């Protein structure tokens, strides 16, 4: 696993790509030894950067829940990600497409939290108690890095 400095550098690279609306070279091409654990560490650092800029963590999503999607992504289990306040759009509202680089629509599960989850050892009951509600999510993912 990479060190925290490397995770921070990668998160900053993705953050800059998002801000400049420019697709960059795939992270895995520059870091072929990157692991799933590294990817989640980069995600945590990216979320930290966004919160420092004033965004709010509102929930989490679970993706790749079907075996077919896992197989197509060469991943053997569902993945998860953060949902920030500016990622929510009300039914019928316009989504500003100019904020995306290469948008794709994905169907995922969203856990909207009533209170934060803490620590790496959260139990099923911790998640249940922190969850305000669970919804089916049409998630607009964006590719800051080329695949």
Would you name each region that the model predicts?
Residues 122-138:
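Internal alpha/beta scaffold segment
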Residues 2-122:
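Extended, compositionally biased flexible segments
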Residues 139-147:
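Single conserved hydrophobic/aromatic residue that forms the stacking wall/gate
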């Amino acid at each position: 696993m990479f060190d925290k400095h490397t995770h921070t550098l990668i998160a900053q690279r993705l953050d800059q790509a998002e801000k400049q609306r420019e697709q960059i070279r795939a992270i895995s091409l520059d870091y072929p030894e990157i692991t799933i654990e590294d990817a989640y560490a980069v995600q945590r650092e990216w979320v930290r950067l966004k919160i420092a800029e004033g965004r709010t963590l509102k929930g989490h999503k679970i993706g790749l829940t079907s075996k077919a999607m896992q197989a197509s992504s060469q991943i053997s289990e569902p993945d998860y990600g953060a949902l920030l306040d500016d990622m929510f759009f009300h039914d019928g509202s316009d989504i500003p497409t100019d904020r995306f680089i290469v948008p794709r629509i994905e169907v995922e599960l969203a856990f909207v939290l009533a209170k934060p989850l803490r620590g790496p050892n959260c139990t099923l009951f911790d998640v249940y108690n922190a969850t305000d509600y669970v919804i089916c999510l049409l998630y607009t993912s964006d590719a800051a890095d080329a695949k």
